[in-house]
Amino acid sequence: MPPSLTPTERTYTIALSLTKYVGPRSAIELIEALGSATALFTDAELRARILPRLPQRIAQQLASPTMVEEALRIEERCQREGIRPIFFLSEDYPAPLREIAVPPMVLYVRGEYVAWAERKHVSVVGTRSISDYGRVLTQQVVRELSATCPASTIVSGLAYGVDIQAHEAALNLSLPTVAVLAHGLDTLYPSAHWRIAEQILRDGGAWVSEYPPGVKPYRQAFVARNRIIAGLSAATIVIEAGEHSGSLSTANYALESGREVFACPGRLTDPESIGCHKLIEEQRAHLYLGASSMMKELGWGILDEGAEAHPFSAPLVEKPASSSLTREYPPHPLLAILIEQGMLSVDELSRLSGMDLLTVRSELFDLELDGWVQARAGGCYSLC
């Protein structure tokens, strides 16, 4: 694989990617068969031999100078707006994305180029109709990843709901985050997320898209971009998903690409958890029980048998502040333990209370909503 493409080859590769009725995989196979995109557009003898064998609607486009002219305009616009095209046949193309069934031939990147090989990419996705439980859970998942695997990069789609919560949580914890968009990088959808999107760029993250500048969002593009979210990531975590949530397509793409999928459980009565429960029931996703459990499943670091689930958590004993000592708390086994012990991890609360992890997480969620406890770094909880 060439370390880089010549400027001419870059232009003609973009031109080929613009050709209608030629999908990314077909375009890549065509380049590999002919040796270069440049030859397809400039070698008269090759064109005379190849074009008649292609469908007429494709051959007419390749015979016209229109595609190359448009490619030159796109390159000029990319340079003007700080957008970097990355090509499938270049060594700087993200290796995990190269392995999916239909990788983009050109990936457009805006912002700091994230070192894919040096970080652990995890996609955090879910419903747009996020519940209060989903908000708390998204923040907790990202917080656990930050504490347990500081080399994490959070990948999501900048959509309403779980996506934007995941990006914002990553930014608050100084984790790089990558937004995969369903349109050209000269604009932003939804526009309500401009502030967070710009902070992603300022804080060393990136926007990525398979669409060149000038392409507006359209329905099919949102499903297509989900394969890129999954393809960039070693694992996908589904926070909340209704029965027909678009985030389930991200999980499907991840599974098709041989990646691991983790689904977070919710209450049985919550419609926004039906999709997650089905993934777990059908054994298409691991039950998400925490970042350390996920890391072991991924082989990112096996803990010793006697080690705690959160090796990077804060000290297990932290005396509550004086205001907590004078506050009157309702009777609850978890509150009683926190009053006596101070800040504890979820695993410690489970061990000391005798409750299973799922019950502890559910109870902590209710207590957090009621203002009795607050989540801390490393998956720990303390009294408010």
Residue ranges and their predicted role:
Residues 1-91, 370-372, 377-384:
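Short, small/acidic-rich helices and loops at N termini and domain boundaries
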Residues 2-7, 87-384:
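Glycine-biased, small-residue-rich flexible motifs in mid-sequence functional cores and linkers
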